[in-house]
Swiss-Prot record:
Positions of Mg(2+) 1 binding: 283, 297
Listed NCBIfam families: CPSaseII_lrg (TIGR01369), PRK05294.1 (NF003671), PRK12815.1 (NF009455)
Domain annotation ATP-grasp: ranges: 131-326, 678-871
Gene source species: Helicobacter pylori (strain J99 / ATCC 700824) (Campylobacter pylori J99)
Protein name: Carbamoyl phosphate synthase large chain
Binding residue positions for Mn(2+) 1: 283, 297
């Protein structure tokens, strides 16, 4: 059946900002879908609020609406663009929920849904409808009951018994779900789940804790052809959300009979739900002893697991699902990797392991115990010839300084406690248990992880015990260790531990070289090497290979450049850096240079099979990078676009004289080394805050006293402001040093940076591109939040409202720094304007997280321009090549973009609602997971749109709760008076009430939690508070923390800085004005 010709305008709904449960995988699927629809001749219209995505680049759609994903905006686009059909299955839960809301409100008249019809979405997502559908086709389900109120939930639990699992309908990443072991826990979980479900429906089920969990990635076409793309096995048993579980593909502990039962059931489920053109994810649980199989749930859309399955098999699920949605059948679609029909089920001759990445260190008070509600921020994937090789490679990919199965404890009781408790380090504690002689059966009783996986870890521990210096001369032993996934660095560490002999990773590598032990590279080809692979998608392995290996060296023909990616998503290093790597690949294609991509993140566009000419799915470690450089014999290496991950490799790469292109290592070193950089700034006569670098705890005290408080402290070489704090006095410094030295040593190698804190300063981000001769000031972004809040967490906008004189000085100083440093490529500079003077805060000679936003806002693709500059060292030529709309002008000695006639604002998105116990107050340590963009004709309207897009909508009437810290009260009174004049009522606790009363501002006094009832929490729970303003800090009393927790729990919109309140007032004053709904292409005309 050929493509449909009765539709022409297709609207694709994106997933919005990166949040827990919905990350870069939907940029990958959305980008693939946009490209596919466009190549088929359809007119593609996209709505997505996330500017850091590749899919929102204007060339991927005919009209790109970077707007909040609301039913109202979608309806307006349908009318304006004359939409024939909507594809909602590429935008995660966000897209499905949006179309369901529109359907319920009668807003989809005359528009067809592609990929999944309303009935299919309802049956798949509504737990009651799903249960009825499963019973109809004879599927076994966990015993359960539905409830729509707290009373019904209590009736259900009396029937189900404890422990019980509570699940909410139409939620993302297990939102609102949990396991209750007693009635008190149950009542709280049931209330939370009812609140989380947009249709107030929850399912109370019998516990399946300890059962084995599997996922099937299924595709079905309009002719009822069905295929299994991949069967994914969860190592962690039921009770841990699959997004937080370590998973493997293909499944290793299923019998063929069980697999066939699951396969048949998956096909029957898709038919009954009504998914007739696209992909779905179906989850099962199997009792480890009785082998009873039950259906858990299904997603009638492309999911996080679909991205993993695509990368694990090389099968482009999103592309195939898109083609099926517009009329093709599986046998009409070609697999791009092998040129065989897409109806062939993929076959794997390797093992894939996925491990999630968490960020508990960023959120004090959040439990690291894993459960049915997802908590991970990102994930890594590794491919190996056997399970242990893949597992150890995955551990090495996590970017948390693990070289393999690191030992965490020798206390057996503490180890057992950690094995019982699902947590991100559980596998490492299991290895520790085996080191202390605990048996496989004993460990199984503690964690219910399948004995096969436990015996594999035990095997690895036994192999570790035998590592000594003799392996450096014994080819059989050393090859055996490499076959088990041991890195050179881990082998060196174990030799030191076992023999107390200092051996470096380089010496292990040298021994391998002498013994002719090197990895061979294999292809991910979807067909276990049965057909010729046309796209190089590679992984390394030391596993014995019966087939002739691809080899360790490539024939040198065309020019090649290696792009080192950013690894797993985590706070401080997210999708923005992957965006830059993808653009580097596109720019190399424009230069007719072959691109070689290295990354280990299965969610991203950079690891899609057709983004680069060659893809290596490997840990971003020096050992792996070196083997790829030797194999590919690249002409250049880009380390500047993947954040801190590749930058950390620059020193070792420079030592081996690897061909780093762009800004050289010596420049990176000057910018990263505080002492060298301070000297550099003094030579250029550029102001910076008073500072010092403490190489010991004693020196930290003396520097702090010399500078004077308040100070801001941070360790060197960190991203995302980790361990960064503002300290007001010597007591706070003492407490900080006592806490930080538990995890970080302060030494000459790892000094502590101490700066004078510029209170109430206006911060700015500048992105620039330099070719050693000329400079392009790509944008000056003004922060809304004042100094002291991490730049990644602050809202920022362009054009700036600062005076022309200050802006001229920023341009002049930026150009001076870029030219004198010798930057070739991108440069990010952070400034602060304090008491009308310009201070330099820091310089990063690499891509920054603001590059995608500025590229969208101003219409110049900065990462592409920078890549071209790094290759050709000609800024003028690069700007001319990419400035298609004549945006760039030359003025006052620098290139710069013409300022737009609109305001573009970037706002951060936080995971507080997913991480119970986290505090919403911001500081110098970054906490946001994603971003949204608001574009409008004024700052107020842009802010209004951005708040809507990041789930913090501005209400234009109602009761506002206000709690202000003492030092802010005088300034706050003026702002609160304006809120009252706009028609709001204020309610405050005693201290703020007195300050407002003294200033003549009317407010209603409410009780704190500790003062009795009814108190402020009661007002929030009753839905009486429309917004909350809270500028207290982390040092505030427990009452204030409980109030902030209540704000999150009750979905109250909140603002935590006075500078944000000022822009909020602008938004409220302008909110009655209509702002025309425009596509990015219209703004950039």
């Amino acid at each position: 059946m050929p493509k449909r010709t009765d539709i022409s305008n297709i609207l694709l709904i994106g997933s919005g900002p990166i949040v827990i449960g919905q990350a870069c995988e939907f940029d990958y699927s959305g980008t693939q879908s946009c490209k596919t629809l466009k190549s088929l001749g359809y007119r593609v219209i996209l709505i997505n609020s996330n500017p850091a995505t590749v899919m929102t680049d204007p060339e991927f759609s005919h009209q790109t609406y970077i707007q909040p994903i609301t039913p109202e905006n979608i309806a307006a686009i349908i009318k304006k663009e004359k939409i024939d059909a909507i594809l909602p299955t590429m935008g995660g839960q966000t897209a499905l929920n949006a179309v369901m809301q529109m359907h319920q409100r009668g807003m989809l008249e005359g528009v067809e849904l592609l990929g999944a019809k309303i009935e299919a979405i309802k049956k798949g997502e509504d737990r009651q409808a799903f249960k009825e559908a499963m019973l109809k086709i004879g599927m076994d389900l966990p015993k359960g009951r539905y409830a729509y109120s707290e009373l019904e939930a209590l009736e259900a639990i009396s029937e189900i018994g404890f422990p019980a699992i509570i699940r909410a309908s139409f939620t993302l990443a297990g939102g609102g779900s949990g396991v209750a072991y007693n009635i008190e826990e149950f009542q709280e979980l049931a209330k939370n789940a009812l609140d989380a479900s947009p249709i107030n429906e929850i399912l109370i089920e019998e516990s399946l804790l300890g059962w084995k969990e599997y996922e099937m990635e299924v595709i079905r076409d309009g002719k009822d052809n069905c295929i299994i793309v991949c069967c994914i096995e969860n190592i962690d048993p039921m009770g841990v959300h699959t997004g937080d579980s370590i998973t493997i593909a293909p499944s290793l502990t299923l019998t063929d009979k069980e697999y066939q039962r699951m396969r048949d059931a998956s096909f029957a489920i898709l038919r009954e739900i009504g998914v007739d053109t696209g992909g779905s994810n179906v989850q099962f649980a199997i009792h480890p002893e009785t082998l009873r199989m039950v259906v858990i749930e299904m997603n009638p859309r492309v999911s996080r697991s679909s991205a993993l399955a695509s990368k694990a098999t090389g099968f482009p699920i999103a592309k195939v699902a898109t083609m099926l949605a517009v009329g093709f059948s599986l046998d009409e679609i070609k697999n791009d990797i092998t040129n065989t029909p897409a109806s062939f089920e993929p076959s794997l001759d390797y093992i894939v392991v996925k491990i999630p990445r968490f960020a508990f260190e960023k959120f004090a008070g959040v439990s690291s115990t894993l459960g049915t509600s997802m908590k991970s921020i990102g994930e890594v994937m590794a491919i190996g010839g056997n399970f242990l090789e893949a597992l150890q490679k995955a551990l090495c990919s996590l970017e948390n300084n693990w070289l393999g199965f690191e030992s965490l404890s020798k206390d057996l009781e503490a180890i057992k406690k950690e094995i019982r408790r699902p947590n991100p380090k559980r596998l490492l504690y299991i290895a520790d248990a085996f080191r202390l002689g605990v048996s496989v059966d004993e460990v199984f009783e503690l964690c219910q992880i399948d004995r096969w996986f436990l015996s594999q870890i035990q095997k690895l521990v036994k192999a570790e015990e035998g590592i000594n210096s003799s392996v450096l001369t014994d080819a059989k032993k050393l090859r055996g260790l490499k076959n088990l996934g041991f890195s050179d660095a881990r082998i060196a560490t174990k030799i030191k531990e076992n023999e107390n002999l200092e051996v470096s990773p380089f010496e292990v590598e040298l021994a391998r070289s002498n013994l002719q032990i090197a990895p061979h590279f294999e292809e991910v080809d979807t067909c276990a090497a049965e057909f010729l692979s046309l796209t190089p998608y590679l992984y390394s392995t030391y596993a014995p290979n019966p087939l002739p290996p691809i080899g360790n060296k490539q024939e040198k023909q065309e020019k090649k450049i290696l792009i080192i990616g950013s690894g797993p998503n985590r706070i401080g290093q997210g999708i923005e850096f992957d965006y830059c790597c993808v653009h580097a690949s596109f720019a190399l294609k424009d230069l007719n240079i072959k691109s070689v991509m290295l990354n280990c993140n299965p969610e991203t566009v950079s690891t899609d099979y057709d983004t680069s000419d060659t893809l290596y799915f490997e840990p971003i470690h020096f050992e792996c990078v070196k083997s790829i450089i030797q194999r590919e014999r690249v002409d250049g290496i880009i380390v500047h676009f993947g954040g801190q991950t590749p930058l950390k490799l620059a020193k070792d790469l420079a030592k081996m004289q690897a061909p780093i292109i762009g800004t050289p290592f010596k420049v990176i070193d000057i910018a990263e080394d505080r002492e060298k950089f301070s000297l550099f700034l003094k030579e250029l006569d550029i102001k910076q805050p008073e500072n010092g670098m403490a190489k010991s705890v004693d020196e930290a005290y003396s520097i702090a006293n010399a500078i004077g408080f308040p100070i801001i402290v941070r360790p060197s070489y960190v991203l995302g402001g980790q361990h960064m704090q503002i300290l007001e006095n010597i007591e706070e410094l003492r407490h900080y040093l006592e806490s930080v030295t538990h995890s970080l040593e302060i030494s000459p190698k790892n000094p502590l940076l101490i700066d004078k804190f510029l209170e109430k300063a206006v911060e700015l981000d500048v992105d620039a591109i330099c070719d050693k001769k000329e400079v392009y000031i790509a944008g000056i972004l003004q922060h809304i939040e004042e100094a002291g809040i991490h730049s990644g967490d602050s809202a920022c906008f362009i054009p700036s409202t600062l005076s022309p004189e200050i802006l001229d000085e920023i341009e002049r100083v930026s150009a001076k720094i870029a030219l004198h440093l010798g930057v070739v490529g991108l440069l990010n500079i952070q400034f602060a304007v304090y008491q009308n003077s310009l201070y330099l805060i820091e310089v990063n000679p690499r891509a920054s997280r603001t590059v995608p936003f500025l590229s969208k806002a101003l219409g110049v693709p900065l990462a592409k321009v920078a890549t071209r500059v790094m290759v050709l060292e000609d800024l003028k030529e690069a700007l001319k090549f990419y400035d298609k709309k004549n945006i760039v002008e030359y003025s006052k000695g620098v290139y710069k973009p013409k300022m737009p006639h609109f305001v573009a604002l970037k706002e951060a998105v936080f995971p507080f609602n997913k991480l119970y116990g986290s505090d919403l107050i911001l500081g110098p340590e970054m906490k946001s997971t994603g971003e949204v963009m608001g574009i409008a004709r004024s700052l107020g309207l842009a802010f209004f749109k951005a708040q809507t897009a990041c789930f913090n909508p501005i209400k234009n009437k109602g009761l506002i709760f206000v709690s202000i810290k003492d030092k802010d009260k005088e300034e706050a009174c003026v702002l609160m008076k304006r809120l009252v004049e706009l028609g709001f009522e204020l309610c405050t606790t005693e201290g703020t009430h007195k300050a407002l009363e003294k200033a003549g501002v009317k407010s209603l006094k409410v009780l704190k939690i500790s003062e009795g009832r009814p108190n402020i929490m009661d007002l929030m729970m009753n839905g009486e508070i429309s917004m909350a303003i809270n500028t207290s800090d982390h040092k505030s009393q427990d009452d204030a923390k409980l109030i902030r927790a209540s704000v999150l729990k009750n979905h109250v919109s909140y603002f935590t800085t006075l500078s944000a309140i000022e822009v909020l007032l602008l938004a409220l004053e302008e909110s009655s004005q209509e702002d025309e709904l425009l596509a990015l292409q219209d703004y950039l005309k």
